[in-house]
Structures are given as C-alpha cells and as structure tokens.
Amino acid sequence: MTKWKRANPNGTRDYLFEECTLIEEVEQKLRRTFLERGYEEIRTPTIEFYDVFAFQSRPIDEEKMYKFFDEKGRIIVLRPDMTIPLARVVGTQRCDTPLKVTYSGNVFRANESLAGKYNEIVQSGIEVIGIDNVRAEIECVISVIQSLQKLKVQSFTIEIGQVQLYKCIVKKLSIHEEEEKVLRTYIESKNYAALSNFIRDKKLDRCDETVKLLEKLPRLFGNLEVIEEAEKLASSNEMKMAITRVKEIYEAIEKLGYGSYISIDLGMIQHLDYYTGVIFKGYIYEIGEEIVSGGRYDELIGNFGEMLPAVGLAVQVNQIVKALQEQQEPYERKRIDIMIHYELNRLAEAERLRNLLQKDGKKVALSLFSNLNDTFQFARKNQIVTVVEAKSESLVEYVWKEKWVVQKEGETSCVTFKLR
C-alpha cells in the first residue's frame, strides 16, 4: 500500500521556492491589473457537483474529469474549468449586469499519459457578462494585453477567430455531428490534404461558395486581408456578420497601438463547445505553448438561470512562468538580509527589532538555533551577511568580511534602537 508514497500522480508536480514565488507574483500582477480596470473578484469552490458540468452540450469530456463521491453518494468533481462555475454563480445569484469579474485558481483535467500536459494548472482570468456588443471582446483583449505587458512577457500574440462562422458553414452544408468532429480536427490542425479528401468523399460541390470558404478556412490567418478574402466567399448575412465582428475587434485594438499583439485565424476552433462567437488564443513565439484562451459564450449562463451574453479570457499562469524563466535571467528569490540570534528570554525584544528592521524593506528572520555558531553557519550557507545577537541588555551586530566581525561603532549599522 506504500508503493506510490514517494511519487506524484500523473500530470502533477511539486513547485519549490523560486518557482513558487514567481507563480505568486504572476498571479498578483494579473489580479492587480484586472482590479485596476474595474473587475471584481469571484472565488468558487475547488470541488463542484458533477451536474454543473453535465448539461446537454457536454462541454467538458467526462473522461477528463476527476470524479469522486461525497458523504451522501453524490458525484463530485475537481473543477475542470473556471468559466462554468462562474456561470453557475451569475445564473443562480441573479447578479446585476453588466458585470466584470476576475478570478484565479487551480483547474484539474485528466490528460492522456505522456501527452506532455499537466493535469493541474493555475488559471487567472476575466469575464464580461451582460454585454453583447464588441466592446466586451475589446475590453477583454485590452485587459489581457496590458497584463502581459506588465509581466514583461515578450513576443506574444493573441489570435482572433470566429466559431460562429464555422458553425454557419457546418449548418449550411448539413454536416452531421460525428462528421463535424472529424472535420473540426482537420481544420484546427490545418490538415489541408485531409480536408480536401473530406470534401471529395462527402461529394460537396467545390463550385459552391460555402464549400470554397470551408476549404480555405485553415488558410485564412494573418491580418485584415484575411477578412477581405472571407467576405468575398460569405454566402449568408449570418456569415457576413460573424466576419464583420472580427474585423471590428481587430481594427479597434489596432487603433490603440496594440496591432503587433494580435492576428486573425478564422480556421481556429475552440475545443470547448460552449463558445458561440468570437474566440481567442494567445501564444508566445519562442515556446509555442498556449498562454491565453477564451471567447464569447452567450448560451452558457442560461443553463443555470437567465440567458446572458458573456465573454471571457483565461491566462495560463504556469505557461507564463515558464516563459518568464526562459526569457529572463535566472530568477533569484529575495534572500534574508538580516538574521537575529536571541536568548529565549529576549524573544519579545528580538521580534520587536525584526518588525522595525523590516519596515525599511529588509527581509529579516529570527534564528531557529540556540547556539550562535550554528546561526553563523546557517547564515553563511544561505548568503546572509548580517547577524544581530540580542542578549541580556545589549545588541551585537556581526557582518561577514571573510569572517564574522563585530560592526564597529560609527559605521553604518542596521540596528536602530537599543533593547530596553
């Protein structure tokens, strides 16, 4: 029964020291940026009822959920998604809209072994609820771009797609559900040969404008020229409106000076079925990993209450941390500046000294050792150059200068008061 006691479950890992600090800093900077832009914070439980994710369209594969039973035999899951629980909150709590919310938390999905993906990840994100015009999408994209800039993430791009255009094509060509799943993989992977064979095998008329658009879909990525090409082949008002929406979002963000951070990919199709319109994916060039995902989901909240339009974007914190580690100098956690060694009957005074010294922005810690030499050894091992000894009625300050020496009177000292 102890076979696995020294191992982590598949798809999970431990985060230590510097990496933990960096994850926390990324989360806090994202949170601060979103709060400054008027978003309000929401927290949902790490565990949810299975039914929350089991509505008709089944947006999350059942096999990807971690499931267990509560004390009453009901099926519980570790949340595999952040947006659906937020939709539950908004739908059941009857929140006033429009509403801008932000969140951060862990998400759990059981990926295939050896797929190179973690089963537990950290997501921070935003949702704009109750607005059906392009201002909602624009607000989300601007917020994420600014947050990534503040994190000093280099060479990233956010792709804008339109799942509604794809759904219009599928509907007009009467492609059945099972066939659509296969078609989706061909378009997402930009498998031109397989897509061409699919059109041939289905005996679709290649002279038909909609079929032409379908065949071109994986190639429609780039800038506004892509929109012009798609508009020429759009055979219904619904298709034209879907394309126009992407154009409006792109132009608005470009006018703000963020054009270098965005591109268009009309062949992008999100794997989550609850998206109904414009969708987004963000990447860092050097890594190729997805760092941002999201889109419009106007029908999701209706599963829990009133039907409300909504847009959301999630930032993959783990991937951001990975990018920062690769593009910057090795991250160094802030080391202890001063260590206080004290006699046990001087604990109160030592803690008072620690509080005073840290007000100057220093990192100060109390020694855990009863012997001064042990404190010195620990300080050297951890590159701490100042040790203050609090004993009886006095303070002695030691500094490392090839050896531990007493700080002489008249030299700059970290000690700002005498023990009473």
UniProtKB/Swiss-Prot annotation:
Q: Name one GO biological process term.
A: histidyl-tRNA aminoacylation
According to the UniProt record, one GO cellular component term is: cytoplasm
Record flagged with keyword Repeat: no
Q: Does the keyword Cytoplasm apply?
A: yes
Record's InterPro entries?
A: aa-tRNA-synth_II, aa-tRNA-synth_II/BPL/LPL, HisRS-like_core, HisRS/HisZ, HisZ
Report keywords, A-Z.
Answer: Amino-acid biosynthesis, Cytoplasm, Histidine biosynthesis
At the top level, the lineage of the source is: Bacteria
Q: Where in the cell is it found?
A: Cytoplasm
Q: Annotated pathway, please? A: Amino-acid biosynthesis; L-histidine biosynthesis; L-histidine from 5-phospho-alpha-D-ribose 1-diphosphate: step 1/9
Gene Ontology MF, one: histidine-tRNA ligase activity
Q: What is said about its interaction partners and assembly?
A: Heteromultimer composed of HisG and HisZ subunits.
**What exactly does this protein do?**
Required for the first step of histidine biosynthesis. May allow the feedback regulation of ATP phosphoribosyltransferase activity by histidine.
Another remark in the UniProt entry says: This function is generally fulfilled by the C-terminal part of HisG, which is missing in some bacteria such as this one.
Q: Which family does it belong to?
A: Belongs to the class-II aminoacyl-tRNA synthetase family. HisZ subfamily.
* Name of protein: ATP phosphoribosyltransferase regulatory subunit
Species whose genome carries this gene = Bacillus thuringiensis subsp. konkukian (strain 97-27)
- Lineage of the species this protein comes from: Bacteria, Bacillati, Bacillota, Bacilli, Bacillales
